[in-house]
Amino acid sequence: MSKRRRKVLPKEPVRCEIETLSHDGRGIARADGKTQFVDGALPGETVMAKMVRTRSRFDELRTTEVLEAAPDRQQPPCEFADLCGGCSLQHMSADAQIRFKENTLREHFAHFGGIEPEQWVAPMRSPDSLGYRRKARLGVRYVKARESVLVGFREKRNSFLTDIDRCVVLDPRIGERIEPLRELLHGMAAFDRIAQVEVACGDDTAAMVFRNMDDLVPDDREKLIAFGQAHDLHIYLQPKGPDTVHRIWPESGGRDDERLTYRMDEFDLTMAFHPMDFTQVNAGINRNMVHRAVEWLDVQPGERVLDLFCGLGNFTLPLARKGGQVVGVEGDDAMVVRGRENARLNDLSNVEFHGADLHGDFTGQSWAKEGFDKILIDPPRSGAEEICKYLTAFGANRIVYVSCNPATLARDAGVMVRNGYRLVQAGVMDMFPHTTHVESIALFERSAD
C-alpha cells in the first residue's frame, strides 16, 4: 500500500486580507474558496504570510510581513512573541484584547445558550499585563544537535520548545531566571532526564518543582540546592507521581511545612497551598474576582452558602467571613484537606468541606440534601451541565458562576435559564493578558413566580 503523499507547500509568502479573528486569536482571510487562518494578523490588515499547513477546507499560515497595519497593532513586549506559544496576542493592544474577549463571550452566549445577560458589566482588567503569571509548567528538553538544554513553552502550533532566556509574563522571580535555570540543567548529570519544571509563586516565596525521571546523584542534588540558595527559591523534586513531590531546599519540616501562601487582606485571610495545588495564576485579578463574587452574592448572617468546585477555599473562606454558614465541595480529596487546613489557619468555624464527584451522582450525600440560600460555582473547562440541572433543588435565590470556558458557561447558562433563573449580569475578567483565554463571571437570580 502506497503512503499518502504529503502536499508540497508554497515556498513564497502569499498576500492575505484579514477580515476578522477566530476564537483562538488568528486572523481570518479567504482565497480561492478556502478559509485562511493567519497567525500574527489582525482584522483590517493586509499581510504577507507563509503557508505552514494545508487542509481540504482551510489553510494555516504565519505572518511574515505586515503591509498595512491595523490601529490595534502594537509592538510585542517580548522578543519571542512571534514564535513562543505561551502568548498569542502580544501584537494586539490591551483595549483590543479586552474587546476580543468580550466579543467571544457575547458570541458564545448567543450561539450556545441563545441568551444575553440583562446587563454587561465592565471588564475586569489585570492590574499588571506583564510579570503577572504565578504558576506555569515549563517544558525541558536537551537538544543534542545544539548541545544545550531548552526550558520554556512550546512553539506556536508545534511540539518543539521555544528557545528563550527569559519570560516577561511570568512572575519576575521565575521569568528572569530562565537562563540561569538552563545553565543549571545543562551542568547536571541528569541534563536529559528532567522532564519539566513546575513553577509556583506565593506572596513571599517562589518555588520550582523538578520532575526527575531517575534518582539524582548527590552532586546534582547539591547543584539544585545551591541554585535555590542563590536565587531565593524553594526547590522540590518529583521522582514519580504527584504524591512523591518533596522539598529539598530549605530542609523540610514535614509536608505541612511545604506551603506557599497568599494574602486576601480585604477578608483578613492567609491562604496556604502546596506548589502543585491549583491556584489562580493572576493575584491581582483573583483579589478583584473574589471581591466581585462576594459582593454579588451579598451573603447575610445566618444564610447558608454552597461553594461547588471549591478547591482550597479561595471563595469559600471569604464568603465565610461574611457570617453565613458555608459548605465547600470539591472532587480532589487533597484540596478538601487543604480547605480544612486553611479554615483552621484562619480560625473559621462556620465553614465545612466535603469531597464529592461533582460530575457524578452526589444527591445521596448529606450536604446535598440540605437547602442553600446562595451558591457559587467555579467548575473546570468542561463546565457543570448536570449540576446546573439540579441547582433548583437547592432552592438558592442567587448563584454566581465563575468560568474559564465561555462555551460551557453559555451552555450551562441556557440550562439555568430554562430551569427558572435569570441571567442578570455577566462580564469578562482578564486573568491571562496576551492570550485568548477568556475568564468570565455571571450572576443568576431566581425568576419571580
From Swiss-Prot:
Class in the EC hierarchy, top level: transferase
Domain of life: Bacteria
Binding site for S-adenosyl-L-methionine: Q280, F309, N314, E330, D357, D378
Positions of the catalytic residues: C404 (nucleophile)
Residue sites binding [4Fe-4S] cluster per the record: C78, C84, C87, C167
Sequence ranges assigned to domain TRAM in this UniProt record: 7-65
Keywords annotated in UniProt: 4Fe-4S, Iron, Iron-sulfur, Metal-binding, Methyltransferase, rRNA processing, S-adenosyl-L-methionine, Transferase
EC number: 2.1.1.190
Catalytic activity as recorded in UniProt: uridine(1939) in 23S rRNA + S-adenosyl-L-methionine = 5-methyluridine(1939) in 23S rRNA + S-adenosyl-L-homocysteine + H(+)
Biological process, per Gene Ontology: rRNA base methylation
GO molecular function per UniProt: 4 iron, 4 sulfur cluster binding; iron ion binding; RNA binding; rRNA (uridine-C5-)-methyltransferase activity
Function, as annotated: Catalyzes the formation of 5-methyl-uridine at position 1939 (m5U1939) in 23S rRNA.
HAMAP family (alphabetical): 23SrRNA_methyltr_RlmD
Family, similarity comment: Belongs to the class I-like SAM-binding methyltransferase superfamily. RNA M5U methyltransferase family. RlmD subfamily.
Database matches in PANTHER family: 23S RRNA (URACIL(1939)-C(5))-METHYLTRANSFERASE RLMD (PTHR11061:SF49), RNA M5U METHYLTRANSFERASE (PTHR11061)
Name of the protein in question: 23S rRNA (uracil(1939)-C(5))-methyltransferase RlmD
